[in-house]
Amino acid sequence: MYLELVKKNSVILDKDGNKVKEVELPFIFSFPVRKDIIRRVFLAEFTHSLQPKGRDPMAGKRTSAESFGINLGMARVPRVKNSGEAALAPNTVGGRLTFPPSVDKKLVEEVNDKEKQLAVISALSATADTVFVKARGHVFKDSVSFPIVVTDDIVSLKTASEVEEFLEKIGVYDDVKRVKERIRIRAGKGKMRGRKYKEPIGPLIIVHDSNSPIVKAARNIAGVDVVNAKDVSVIHLAPGAHPGRLTIYTETSIKILDERLSKRLVS
């Protein structure tokens, strides 16, 4: 299939939200948004986080229960000696499972590398479209244009308050407020299992250096994630397989993404 892609332009902002210059974006931000590919790859990558589980092979079988036999006017289920309590059988209290979960079950779903790369390109393209960003429920000022590209010096921000101030100046801090207001206690047993709160998804900051101070500075801000451009995937760009996450790019991260993914596209 032949696609004629047209390059977009974007304004680069500094830490104070002022326009510094205008640059031409690579073709990866002009690719059509393929929700079907994004969903398929998201679900495949999600399976990599699943943990195999099984049961003790002897679970429900640690009993001396045997059937009393026939012609006694009672069911022939295994019964505990000197007690008469039914045991061992799947339909009894404390009995074995008929088909227990197995650690041999194949949990990880495979997906083609080319398809995975196209999904990332498509998800990146959605972050450059205001319609998709709004459809995800993100909140931002009307003056914000997408994609949001900022100068590389933002990676030197060292405290959470500095990062929050930066987000306020570029017009996306309202999205952090939305996340804070909507954090709630999870329904169900997950509360007992280390998953007490459900937190909405907020802004994503894509940087060019994993060791930069902003990585630690932003990790305690509700809903905000910081990811290296070399590692960014559909999991980050389209949480829940819904494309259009509010994303902030550093100038160098755009170049890294272009080098990493543009070979999949023919200009």
Swiss-Prot record:
The keyword Ligase does not apply. InterPro entries: Ribosomal_uL4, Ribosomal_uL4_dom_sf, Ribosomal_uL4_euk/arc_CS, Ribosomal_uL4_euk/arch, Ribosomall_uL4-arc. It comes from the Archaea. GO terms for cellular component: ribonucleoprotein complex; ribosome. Pfam families: Ribosomal_L4 (PF00573). GO terms for biological process: translation. One of its GO terms (molecular function) is rRNA binding. Coiled coil: none annotated. The keyword Ribonucleoprotein applies. PROSITE patterns: RIBOSOMAL_L1E (PS00939). Disulfide bonds: none annotated. SUPFAM superfamilies: Ribosomal protein L4. Keywords: Ribonucleoprotein, Ribosomal protein, RNA-binding, rRNA-binding. Belongs to the universal ribosomal protein uL4 family. One of the primary rRNA binding proteins, this protein initially binds near the 5'-end of the 23S rRNA. It is important during the early stages of 50S assembly. It makes multiple contacts with different domains of the 23S rRNA in the assembled 50S subunit and ribosome. Forms part of the polypeptide exit tunnel. Part of the 50S ribosomal subunit. This is Large ribosomal subunit protein uL4. The lineage of its organism: Archaea, Thermoproteota, Thermoprotei, Sulfolobales, Sulfolobaceae.
